[in-house]
C-alpha cells in the first residue's frame, strides 16, 4: 500500500528518492515525504499532503543535500491524511527518522507506556510509536542502532516494512520486514531500498528480497548484512531482476491503464510462451510435471484470492471442474482465514495474487500450509512473498502492472488457470483428445482475437460518453460470463466512481429488477453459449422496464442487435475462453467513462495497487 524508497551511496540522494517515489505512485497514496542526512550531519525531514509533485515543489527552496536518505508515500490507516501524519516520522530528539508500511496492532499500548515515561508524540500514527520506541530503548539501554531496532521490534505485534536512519550514524540504513515486502538493491558502492523492485531496476539488477523477520544493515563501504530479529546472521540470496524500464513508462499512451489494456495480446503470448505448443497441440506446465502426484491425488481444490484475482478464480473454478471433474471452492482470502475452514492434506490450495504480497492471501496460504494442504501460487511479481511461500506455482509473466485497476493481470491469471486445467485434465484422462486439442488451438488464437476486439476502442469511447450521466450500472452474465460481469462492474466502480453491481442474469428477477428504469444502463454479456436464449429473455425484461442495454455478443449475432441499445460484437471462440475476450470491452468501457469524467484513471481515490495490510 505505502511506498518505501531508500538510498545510501555517493550520489545526491534526493533525485533518486523522488524518482523512486514516482515509480511507486501506482501503489496509491495520500501524502509523501523524505528524510536526508546532509554532509554537516543534519537530519532534514520534509513532507506534504497530496502528490509527489507537491513534495518536490515544497522542497524547491529547502536544503535537500545528502547522499543518504529515505522516502515514503503514505496511504492512511492510522490518522487522517496530513503533513503531520505523513512519513518519515522522527524521534523526540530528532536524531532518528523512520518510514513504515504495515500496521502495528499494539501501538496504542506501546504509546501509553512511552507517554508514561515522558515521551511526547506529534502525530496520530502507529509509525511514530516505532521511532520513539527505538530511541527510548537506544538511550535507556545504551544500545547501538541495530540492537535497539531488534529490541524494539521484538515488542511489536503486527506487520511492518521499515527503514530507519540516525544522524549520528550517517553511513547506514537499518531496514526490516515482517509480513510486508521490502527489497534491497545492491549497486557499486551503493544500496537501494524499495517496497518492490521498480524504484531500483534503473540502477542495478541485483536485489535481495528480505524474508519475514529479517533485518538488513546497509552500511557505506561494507557488504550487505542480513540478520534475524534475534541477531542470527542470515544467508544472502542475491537475485537478478528482469524488468525492462520501458514497462514502467506510458509509452505514448495517456494512461498506464490504457497501455496495459492494449498490451494484453503480447502479454498473453508471453504467458503462453513455452507452455502452449500449437504444433503438438500440447500444454506443458513445469509445476504439473514436477508435482503431478500431489496435484492428481487431490480430492478438492480451494482457490483463495481477493478482488480481481477472486473473479479470475471463479472462472478457474468452472474450468477445473468442467475439464478435470474435481470439486473446486473459491474463497475470499480475508474470510477464509478467519472462518475456521476444514483443510486437509488431500486439498490443493491455489493462491492468486498479482503482486504476490496481498496480506490476506498470504495469511490464507500460511493457514492452509499449517493444516497440511499443498499450495499452488499464481502470481505476476517474480520473487514476491507468495511464490516463496508456496510449494509450486506458475507466474503469469505479463510484466509490471502500474494502473491500480487490474487489466492484463486478470487475463493473465485466467490464461494460467486455463492451462492448469488443461494440463491436469490430460493427466487425469478426463478430457477427450479431440476436445483437448480444440481448446489448445483456440487458446493459442486468443491474442490475435484480442487484437480484433481492441479495434473497437474508438467506438467504445464514443458510446461511453452517452453513459457518463449514470449513477448506477448493472452487469449481467451467466456461466463463464458471470465472473466477467463481476469484473466489469468492479472496473467501473474502481475508476469512474459509479456504483455498479454484477449479477448472474437469472438472479436479476430476485431483486435487482426493481432498480431498472430509463436511467439504469445494463451491460449484458450475451455471447453464443448454452444459455443464450435465456439471456435474451433477461434482455427483454430489462427493455420492458425502459433500461438501456449494452450487449456484448458473438460476431454475426442478428437477434440481440434488434433489441439492445448498443451492441459490441466479439470474435467467435469456445465458451470457456469467452471471458478472455468479453472482459476487454468492459475494461475499455470503464476506462473511457472515467476519462470522460476527468478522473485520475491510474490512481483512483482511496485505492492501493498492492494491499499489504489487512
Model-derived regions, located:
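Active-site phosphate/pyrophosphate-binding segments
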Residues: 264-268, 272-302, 392-521, 594-614
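Conserved short alpha-helical segments that host acidic/polar catalytic motifs at enzyme active sites
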Residues: 1-250, 254, 269-300, 338, ...
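Glycine-rich phosphate-binding loops that contact phosphosugars or nucleotide phosphates
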Residues: 296-438, 442-445, 527-566, 589, ...
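Glycine-rich oxoanion-binding loops at beta->alpha junctions
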Residues: 67, 71-84, 279-292, 316-352, ...
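Hydrophobic alpha-helical scaffolding
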Residues: 7-10, 100, 120, 138-142, ...
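Generic C-terminus detector
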Residues: 548, 561-563, 573-614
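Structural motif
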Residues: 68, 96, 300-302, 348, ...
Amino acid at each position: 500500500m505505502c511506498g518505501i524508497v531508500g538510498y545510501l551511496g555517493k550520489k545526491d540522494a534526493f533525485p533518486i528518492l523522488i524518482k523512486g517515489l514516482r515509480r511507486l505512485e501506482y501503489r496509491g497514496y495520500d501524502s509523501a515525504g523524505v528524510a536526508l542526512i546532509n554532509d554537516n550531519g543534519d537530519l532534514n525531514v520534509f513532507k506534504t499532503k497530496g502528490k509527489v509533485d507537491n513534495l518536490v515543489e515544497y522542497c524547491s527552496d529547502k536544503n535537500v543535500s545528502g547522499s543518504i536518505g529515505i522516502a515514503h508515500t503514505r496511504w492512511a490507516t492510522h490518522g487522517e491524511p496530513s503533513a503531520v501524519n505523513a512519513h518519515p516520522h522522527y524521534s523526540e530528539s530528532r536524531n532518528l527518522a523512520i518510514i513504515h508500511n504495515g500496521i502495528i496492532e499494539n501501538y496504542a499500548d506501546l504509546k501509553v507506556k512511552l507517554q508514561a515515561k515522558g515521551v511526547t508524540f506529534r502525530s496520530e500514527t502507529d509509525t511514530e510509536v516505532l521511532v520513539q520506541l527505538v530511541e527510548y530503548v537506544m538511550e535507556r539501554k545504551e544500545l547501538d542502532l541495530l540492537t535497539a531496532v531488534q529490541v524494539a521490534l521484538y515488542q511489536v505485534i503486527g506487520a511492518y516494512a521499515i527503514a530507519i536512519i540516525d544522524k549520528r550514524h550517517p553511513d547506514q540504513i537499518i531496514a526490516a520486514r515482517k509480513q510486508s515486502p521490502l527489497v534491497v538493491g545492491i549497486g557499486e558502492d551503493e544500496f537501494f531500498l524499495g517496497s518492490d523492485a521498480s524504484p531500483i531496476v534503473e540502477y542495478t539488477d541485483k536485489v535481495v528480497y528480505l524474508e519475514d523477520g529479517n533485518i538488513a544493515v546497509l552500511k557505506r563501504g561494507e557488504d550487505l548484512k542480513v540478520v534475524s530479529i534475534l541477531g542470527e546472521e542470515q544467508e544472502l540470496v542475491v537475485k537478478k531482476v528482469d524488468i525492462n524500464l520501458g514497462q514502467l513508462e506510458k509509452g505514448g499512451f495517456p494512461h498506464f491503464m490504457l497501455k496495459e489494456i492494449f498490451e494484453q495480446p503480447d502479454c498473453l503470448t508471453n504467458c503462453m510462451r513455452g507452455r502452449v505448443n500449437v504444433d503438438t497441440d500440447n500444454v506443458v506446465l513445469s509445476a504439473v510435471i514436477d508435482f503431478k502426484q500431489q496435484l492428481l491425488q487431490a480430492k478438492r481444490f480451494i482457490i483463495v484470492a481477493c478482488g480481481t484475482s477472486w473473479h479470475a478464480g471463479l472462472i478457474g473454478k468452472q474450468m477445473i471442474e468442467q475439464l478435470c471433474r474435481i470439486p473446486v471452492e473459491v474463497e475470499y482470502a480475508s474470510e477464509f482465514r478467519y472462518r475456521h475452514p476444514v483443510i486437509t492434506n488431500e486439498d490443493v490450495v491455489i493462491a492468486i495474487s498479482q503482486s504476490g504480497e496481498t496480506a490476506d492471501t498470504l495469511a490464507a496460504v500460511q493457514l492452509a500450509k499449517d493444516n497440511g494442504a499443498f499450495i499452488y501460487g499464481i502470481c505476476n511479481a517474480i520473487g514476491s512473498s507468495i511464490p516463496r511461500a508456496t510449494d509450486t506455482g506458475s507466474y503469469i509473466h505479463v510484466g509490471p502492472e502500474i494502473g491500480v485497476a487490474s487489466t492484463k493481470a486478470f487475463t493473465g491469471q485466467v490464461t494460467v488457470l486455463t492451462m492448469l486445467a488443461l494440463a491436469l485434465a490430460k493427466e487425469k484422462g478426463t478430457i477427450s483428445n479431440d476436445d483437448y486439442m480444440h481448446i489448445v488451438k483456440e487458446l493459442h488464437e486468443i491474442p490475435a482475437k484480442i487484437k480484433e476486439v481492441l479495434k473497437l476502442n474508438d467506438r467504445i469511447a464514443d458510446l461511453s460518453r452517452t453513459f457518463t450521466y449514470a449513477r448506477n450500472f448493472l452487469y449481467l452474465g451467466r456461466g463463464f460470463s458471470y465472473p466477467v460481469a463481476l469484473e466489469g462492474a468492479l472496473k467501473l466502480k474502481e475508476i469512474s466512481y459509479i456504483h455498479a453491481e454484477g449479477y448472474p442474469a437469472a438472479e436479476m428477477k430476485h431483486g435487482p429488477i426493481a432498480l431498472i428504469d430509463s436511467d439504469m444502463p445494463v451491460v449484458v454479456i450475451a455471447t453464443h453459449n448454452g444459455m443464450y436464449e435465456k439471456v435474451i429473455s433477461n434482455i427483454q425484461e430489462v427493455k420492458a422496464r425502459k433500461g438501456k442495454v449494452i450487449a456484448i455478443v458473438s460476431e454475426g449475432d442478428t437477434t440481440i442487435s434488434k433489441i439492445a441499445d448498443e451492441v459490441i460484437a466479439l470474435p467467435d471462440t469456445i465458451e470457456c475462453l469467452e471471458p478472455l475476450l468479453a472482459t476487454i470491452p468492459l475494461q475499455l468501457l470503464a476506462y473511457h467513462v472515467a476519462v470522460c469524467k476527468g478522473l485520475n484513471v491510474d490512481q483512483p481515490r482511496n485505492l492501493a495497487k498492492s494491499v499489504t495490510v489487512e
